[in-house]
């Protein structure tokens, strides 16, 4: 049989469908911190819908719940520990500057 006339065959590989990240019994609410924290990055940013594998409606509800939790200070706006680390200061060589008149 000629290559151009040969029918196209797709290899049939078995695949395991991933479980949805949110079950039917899970309530998307700002008080449900164990659920909300799964959809936040290490830096405290809301992960995208593609990364979360959520539907559009679920992503919207998660986003609203995260924002409510941030406003009520259940969640930090930023999760940056390095911001508060104190660096060793260098001593000043010159004394206080004086203005000449």
From Swiss-Prot:
Organism taxonomic ancestry: Eukaryota, Viridiplantae, Streptophyta, Embryophyta, Tracheophyta
Key words, A-Z: Chloroplast, Plastid, Ribonucleoprotein, Ribosomal protein, RNA-binding, rRNA-binding
Pfam families in the record: Ribosomal_S18 (PF01084)
Region described as Disordered: spans on this chain: 1-23, 82-101
Annotated localization: Plastid, Chloroplast
Main subcellular location of this protein, as a coarse class: plastid
Superkingdom in the source lineage: Eukaryota
Any GO molecular function: small ribosomal subunit rRNA binding
Record keyword Calcium present: no
Record text on subunit structure and interactions: Part of the 30S ribosomal subunit.
Biased composition regions of type Basic residues, renumbered to the chain: 1-19
NCBIfam families: S18
InterPro entries documented for this protein: Ribosomal_bS18, Ribosomal_bS18_CS, Ribosomal_bS18_sf
Family recorded in the similarity comment: Belongs to the bacterial ribosomal protein bS18 family.
This protein's name: Small ribosomal subunit protein bS18c
